[in-house]
Design a protein with these regions (language model features):
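Phosphate-group recognition and catalysis centered on beta-loop-alpha active-site segments
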Residues: 1-251
């Protein structure tokens, strides 16, 4: 039986400055199996890891995709670090058996991630996800990526504004057509019935946003057909890793 896979949100979550090399390093020390982050494609084709849609340049807000790497490296984060590139992250942590999950809003960013991952021989260690704030149908973001690569893991994060998750929100037909392997839901909408439904349909089941001990315990204890929830994301990965190791320690 596989234990639940733990993703550190933007690295070590609420500890330190998110989406930095130091935060990613701290998450690995905590014991996460994967790092969850956001990927943005720059004007020159470089991929950077940050959640910003825009940055200040000459006092004006400029969209990330209109900036180049020189612009990005002039911007300093709160701890003095710069926004990391994907290549910098892959290089920094190449000796670790760590996985990466990237939220994207542009299919071209996903394609570039795949190309860089192949350069580093990490294609089996990456996942590309539709963000939970993305309101459009799955083909708009994943069709182009799936045409480019038939095997990379794709993640359907259910649109956050669906207060009740019905079967239509899962987009099961498109998931099967596009070979999208994972359904990811916010912890507020995760339930045992939904867990069963997703697993019976043949997909992996992820839960994001868990913070509090009670919900962590509930989700890490949940089993269906002898299997735990496949993965969880948290801004408190130290707490989740510790509880996972206690609850699932004999598996």
């Amino acid at each position: 039986m596989s234990r639940t896979f733990i993703w550190g949100h933007r690295g070590a979550g609420f500890t330190g400055v998110q989406n930095t090399l130091s935060s990613f390093r701290n998450a690995i020390k905590i014991g996460v199996e994967g790092i969850k982050t956001e990927a943005r494609l720059l004007k020159g084709g470089e991929v950077v890891l940050c959640s910003y849609q825009s940055l200040k340049k000459n006092g004006k807000d400029v969209l990330i995709n209109e900036l180049d790497i020189e612009d990005i490296k002039e911007f300093k984060l709160e701890n003095g670090e710069t926004i990391p590139t994907l290549r910098e992250v892959f290089t920094a942590f190449k000796k670790y058996d760590i996985a990466y999950n990237f939220d994207i809003i542009d299919p071209n960013a996903g394609i570039k991630i795949i190309e860089i991952a192949e350069e580093f021989n990490l294609i089996d260690r990456i996942e590309i996800a539709k963000p939970s704030i993305y309101p459009h149908p799955l083909p708009t973001i994943f069709s182009k990526i799936r045409e480019f690569n038939q095997d990379v893991t794709l993640v359907n994060s259910i649109f956050l504004k669906n207060s009740i998750i019905n079967e239509k929100h899962l987009e099961l037909e498109d998931m099967k057509k596009l070979n999208i392997q994972v359904i990811n839901v916010n912890f507020n909408y995760a339930s045992y019935d939904l867990f069963k439904k997703v697993k019976d349909e043949g997909f992996k089941f992820y839960i994001w946003g868990i913070l509090f001990a009670r919900s962590i315990k509930n989700f890490l204890s949940m089993k269906y057909k002898g299997e735990y929830v496949d993965a969880v994301f948290s801004n408190l990965p130290n707490r989740v890793v510790k509880m996972r190791d206690e609850i699932q320690k004999f598996n």
